[in-house]
Design a protein with these regions (language model features):
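Bacterial N-terminal signal peptides
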Residues: 4-15
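Boundary at the C-terminal end of the N-terminal hydrophobic targeting segment
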Residues: 18-22
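Preferential activation on post-signal-peptide N-terminal prodomains/segments
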Residues: 23-63, 67-68
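Cap/lid segment of the alpha/beta-hydrolase catalytic domain
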Residues: 147-243, 249, 255, 280-291
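Serine-hydrolase catalytic core
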Residues: 264-267, 284, 301-348
Length: 348
């Protein structure tokens, strides 16, 4: 019975649909598309022109999103809080972190947590909870001769290890071992491990860096690799703030990818008293040429690096642009990218 009713319904519908009229080549209000050459290539070129135009126009559009009031530091911070909230949202810093008393020491029966000793500090392998099953790992440099003068999160580039910027393994010049130098000057220093740029085939398919692989996975969850790494940094800020109270002096300093995380973390968290950025600060108008894991949806609508700096203000922001990471990622199924110092990019 159901099949008979369905057939009757289909027949009644077809009986009222007019037959197509011969000789009509276009729909009303349209005209035939006439293009010469490779249509697909022309489409890509048109999209490219449009996006570059939008990037160029984004700089002038940003002002409408800002209502800065510089009458006092407190009033200023309140006036830019909507921008700070927007930045947190697009970076994926939206989840509640796991509270903890202190980082746990990482040791085994073959390797103690104390991995090295300096003239004025001890170095421990540590890990700390962040979100759910996500933990931060790295090295903690603790002064041995006096109470810490400040608490600093020192963030290496993605192609550096905590051991390298602490001077424990080769790979970073002595003058650039900033975690070691901070500890030598009486700071307690936490050095997180970042996801690296190691490039390899994934599932025997496209060759992706470790960062691009996790960037793509996090995108499906409505989050961002940058956001997860920021949570690791801010979990350390939570700990420093709890231990030091209102008098805690907290700083972040990073190089390359670490400089990016330092700038973002100071922009979104006013508990950070001072921020140092090395090998990152500059124009983001060529963001499309940088590693894809730096891509943040809607970022340039409100934020270039200069706008991020205004979120750090009036707290001190130190920018050191003498050296930048040099990265060249070929396209082997993943996104190609080039990183170089701005002056080198201009020479090219």
């Amino acid at each position: 019975m159901r099949s008979q009713c369905l057939c009757a319904l289909i027949w009644s519908f077809l009986s009222v649909v007019p037959e197509p009229q011969s000789g009509i080549d276009t729909l009303p209000g349209t005209r035939p598309l006439v293009m010469q050459g490779d249509i697909a290539s022309q489409l890509v070129e048109g999209v490219d022109r449009f996006l570059l135009s939008e990037l160029a126009r984004s700089v002038d559009r940003r002002a409408v999103h800002w209502k800065r009031d510089t009458s006092s530091p407190a009033v200023y911070n309140n006036s830019v809080e909507p921008n700070r909230a927007r930045l947190r949202h697009i970076l994926g810093v939206r989840d509640s972190r796991v509270p903890f008393e202190a980082p746990e020491l990482v040791n085994t029966t073959q390797r103690p947590a104390l991995v090295a000793r300096g003239a004025h500090y001890d170095v421990f392998a540590v890990r700390w909870p962040v979100l759910g099953n996500i933990h931060g790992e790295g090295l903690l440099l603790v002064p041995t001769k006096a109470k810490p003068g400040a608490h600093v999160i020192a963030i290496p580039d993605a192609d550096q290890t905590p051991e390298q910027i602490c001077g424990l393994t080769p790979g970073v010049p002595e003058e650039s071992q900033f975690a070691r130098r901070l500890a030598d000057n009486g700071c307690r220093v936490l050095v997180p491990t970042l996801i690296d740029r190691h490039l390899e085939k994934r599932n025997n398919r496209a060759a992706l860096t470790s960062r691009e692989l996790l960037y793509r996975s996090a995108f499906e969850l409505g989050r961002h690799l940058i956001g997860y790494e920021l949570h690791k940094v801010l979990a350390a800020v939570d700990w420093f703030s709890k231990e030091g109270g209102e008098d805690a002096r907290i700083g972040v300093f990073g190089y390359g990818e670490g400089g990016m995380l330092a700038l973002y973390s100071a922009a979104i968290d006013t508990r950070i008293d001072v921020c140092g950025v090395s090998g990152f600060f500059g124009s983001r108008q060529n963001l499309w040429n940088e590693p894809i894991d730096r891509n943040v949806f809607g970022l340039l609508d409100q934020f270039g690096d200069a706008e991020l700096a205004t979120l750090v203000s009036p707290r001190p922001l130190v920018i050191e642009n003498r050296s930048f990471p040099k990265v060249s990622l070929p396209s082997q199924g993943g996104a190609p990218a080039e990183l170089a110092a701005p002056i080198d990019a201009l020479k090219e």
